[in-house]
Every structure is written in C-alpha cells, then in structure tokens.
Amino acid sequence: MTIAHVAWVVPCFDEATRLDRAAFLALTEGCAPASVIFVDDGSRDGTLALLNDLAQARPGQIEVVALAKNQGKAEAVRQGMLRALAGPAGIIGYLDADLATPPAELQRLVELARSSDLDVLLGSRVQLLGRAIQRSSARHYVGRVFATCASLSLGLPVYDTQCGAKLFRRTQALAAALAEPFTSRWAFDVELLGRLAHPPSGVDPIAVARMHEEPLRIWSDVPGSKLHPLAAVRGGLDLLRLALKTRLGR
C-alpha cells in the first residue's frame, strides 16, 4: 500500500532566534515520506537565511517560499498550502514555527491521518488527566470564549479551532477553499473550516463525519508569541462577520 506523502506548511515571521533547526530536520524523517514548506512572511531578521540553509540541508524535502513583504499568517499559510497542492502531497497540514506541538505529536497526527479516511484532522488542546497541556490561565479562558464563538459561527461542534496543528486530505473542497485569499487575518482557521463545510456550488462539502479533533498529549506555550491582546477583539469581530456570512448564505 502506498503511504501518503505529507507536506507541512510552516509560516515564519522573524523566527531566527526561535526556529529549532534540529527538530525540523527530524520532522522530515519522522513523517517520511514528507516535506516541509517554510513560508517567510517578509521577515526583517535572519529568518530567510536560516530557512534557505535548512533547505540546502534537505534538498527535495524542505522548500522555502519567500514573500516580498509581510502579508500576515493567513496569507502565508494559504500560499504554502497552494505550493503543497502543486506537489505530490496527499495530505497537507500546517503548524506553528515555535513547535508548541512537538514533533512526536505531529508524527502521531500524521499516522492517524494516514490510517484513516478523515479529510480534516485537528489537533486539540484539551487538558485531561495524563496529558501535558501547558497554557497560561488567561490564554486558556480567552481561548475558550473564542472557541465557543467559533463553534457557534460554524455550526460545528468544534472544541479548538486555533491550535496550530492541522492536517487536510487533498480534496476538491480543499483546493476550492484556498482559491481566494482569506477575508480574516485573525480567524482564518475558522474561515477555512467554514469554506470546507460550505464550498462553492458544484464542489462536494467535507462531511462532519470526516472531520476529527484529536486531543494532544503534549502542548506548551512557547515564549515570544507575536499575538497581540487586540487580536482577540479583532478575531471576535471577524467571527461575527463570518457567522453573518454563513447565515445569510455564501
């Protein structure tokens, strides 16, 4: 049986001091056959040089997409996923450059995606006994409010839309969802799920039965996050707009 090639998209903006070279090199081996597509989002430090060095260390496995100017995480992810769709990947995912979800967990998600018929697989930060989810109380509670609003706006029982570890099977719905830039910079994860569940006419939607949230065993906040407190407010406004768009029809 052919093992599906997985492509991980990693958006990067000024990550030169946080990027774990060894961990990403190991990720390409642990998820093999796999590739990593780094998208440099107009970084102002040495990020692009570091990424190019990584690509030289793993030719054919690590690729760099360099955006001329900063366009935001949403567009960086979209551009990376479009590049992945142009390649051999049967499964395409994205993750945060800080590896808050560690490589071992990412490999576990890949194995689950490969061994199932799921079209959407989301890592979910659920604090349970026996799990090591290290997240500040403030972020946890703000995140719960946001996630509840996201679930209501989508009309889907999703627990955690913002965890930076997601996998998608190559489908017509995924290609359609990525065809146009996201309208939201702050809630693009939610917008992507909405596009998959409510695609344009003529495209089969992704059924809820083929979406799955997998509780992570390990996840930890990494110092140096660029998320501004106002992002939660902007994200909330974006959710309201997305909810109205869904209710009024696409």
Language model features with spans:
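Cell-envelope/extracellular polymer assembly enzymes that use nucleotide-activated donors
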Residues: 5-7, 35, 191
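Short, well-formed alpha-helical segments that are part of the catalytic scaffolds
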Residues: 14-29
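A conserved acidic beta->alpha catalytic loop
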Residues: 40-49, 99
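Acidic helix N-cap motif at the loop->helix transition within catalytic regions
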Residues: 17-21, 45-54
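Acceptor/aglycone-binding surface of glycosyltransferases and processive sugar-polymer synthases
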Residues: 67-86, 91, 103-186, 222-227
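Short beta-strand/loop segment that forms part of the nucleotide-sugar
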Residues: 33-43, 65-66
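Hydrophobic helical membrane-anchoring modules
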Residues: 1-3, 179-250
